[in-house]
């Protein structure tokens, strides 16, 4: 299946990006999502949000620190 979420690097770390750049859209589409955008997460900074991301691709788990 698919779901929306903040795409994760290994160890529950976000992909940082610059608002207004196409980086998140490209990253998300390369991983099978339909689109991507940058969103601000409190305590983590700007991160990539993907729409319709396949289940096989990791997303950020709430409450777990980047390590």
Curated annotation (Swiss-Prot):
Coarse class of the protein's main subcellular location: secreted
Keyword Flavoprotein on entry: no
Transmembrane segments: none
UniProt subcellular location: Secreted
Family affiliation: Belongs to the long (4 C-C) scorpion toxin superfamily. Sodium channel inhibitor family. Alpha subfamily.
SS bond list: 13-66, 17-39, 24-48, 28-50
Function: Binds to sodium channels (Nav) and inhibits the inactivation of the activated channels, thereby blocking neuronal transmission.
Expression by tissue: Expressed by the venom gland.
Family annotation (InterPro entries): LCN-type_CS_alpha_beta_dom, Scorpion_toxin-like, Scorpion_toxin-like_sf, Scorpion_toxinL/defensin
Database matches in SMART domains: Knot1
Organism: Orthochirus scrobiculosus (Central Asian scorpion)
Domain LCN-type CS-alpha/beta: 3-67
Protein name: Neurotoxin Os3
Gene Ontology annotations for the cellular component aspect, listed alphabetically: extracellular region
A family per Pfam: Toxin_3
Keywords annotated in UniProt: Disulfide bond, Ion channel impairing toxin, Neurotoxin, Secreted, Toxin, Voltage-gated sodium channel impairing toxin
Any one biological process term the GO annotation gives: defense response
UniProt remark on domains: Has the structural arrangement of an alpha-helix connected to antiparallel beta-sheets by disulfide bonds (CS-alpha/beta).
Gene Ontology molecular function terms on file: sodium channel inhibitor activity; toxin activity
Protein's UniProt keywords contain Disulfide bond: yes
């Amino acid at each position: 299946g698919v779901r929306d979420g903040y795409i994760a690097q290994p160890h529950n770390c976000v992909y940082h990006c610059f608002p207004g750049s196409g980086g998140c859209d490209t990253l998300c589409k390369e991983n099978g999502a339909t689109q991507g955008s940058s969103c601000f997460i409190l305590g983590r900074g700007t991160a990539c949000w993907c729409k319709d991301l396949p289940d096989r691709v990791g997303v950020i788990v709430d409450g777990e620190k980047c390590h």
